[in-house]
Amino acid sequence: MASAGGDECEGAAPEADRPHQRPFLIGVSGGTASGKSTVCEKIMGLLGQNEVEQRQRKVVILSQDRFYKVLTAEQKAKALKGQYNFDHPDAFDNDLMHRTLKNIVEGKTVEVPTYDFVTHSSQEIRDMFHLRLFVDTDSDVRLSRRVLRDVRRGRDLEQILTQYTTFVKPAFEEFCLPTKKYADVIIPRGVDNMVAINLIVQHIQDILNGDICKWHRGGSNGRSYKRTFSEPGDHPGMLTSGKRSHLESSSRPH
């Protein structure tokens, strides 16, 4: 996600007198079908951005899915059989992703590619995010969501499960789960955790209002703490199967 941020910490200046606002990047990660997109959409809704015309929005969602490499004819044939590994980092055009994020941070206009899931037409990136979130959802719940979603896409159940055990689960454990230590915020239960969602929304609202002093005081790149958000009834300080985030190696639904 990206929102319009600012650079001043000396008190609120009239909007017309403020310097040009720089985008504030938030990386959202998690396992396949953990609810990453749902969390982002919920945040957008609470910020009132879904009712705003696309070009007038102050907060936008940029999906890593858009940066899949274009498949060759041979790779497309494998993909149709569920034999292509969409979860490996090499499946993404990381150079294009890095250039796009860099241009966004610099306030430049960018063109984002669109990936078609029917035709299948690094640290460097991780460090570009000012805030990193990880959406934590139980693995059984994620698998059931993925199965239901892919069946709706016309996929065969046996193919779905084979792809999950062959590619998705191993890639999550090798590439996504190890990024746990880099997350600033963990969101247990995803979109159901409104304590976390509301607090993140408030932070974004502060940034949109130009009140970002707290981010600058907290340390480099706007990160001042690592935290797992719990709701009433949760054991204080307890991480329930916590996982952490960054866009570069997240295990996205395919």
Curated annotation (Swiss-Prot):
Residue ranges, compositional bias (Basic and acidic residues): 245-254
Signal peptide per UniProt: none
Record-listed Phosphothreonine modification sites: 228
Binding site for ATP: 30-38, 192
Pfam families: PRK
Top-level class of the enzyme under EC nomenclature: transferase
Modified residues (Phosphoserine): 230
E.C. number: 2.7.1.48
Region (Disordered) location: 1-29, 224-254
Keyword Nucleotide-binding applies: yes
Biological or metabolic pathway of the protein: Pyrimidine metabolism; CTP biosynthesis via salvage pathway; CTP from cytidine: step 1/3; Pyrimidine metabolism; UMP biosynthesis via salvage pathway; UMP from uridine: step 1/1
Family: Belongs to the uridine kinase family.
Function: Phosphorylates uridine and cytidine to uridine monophosphate and cytidine monophosphate. Does not phosphorylate deoxyribonucleosides or purine ribonucleosides. Can use ATP or GTP as a phosphate donor.
Record protein name field: Uridine-cytidine kinase 1
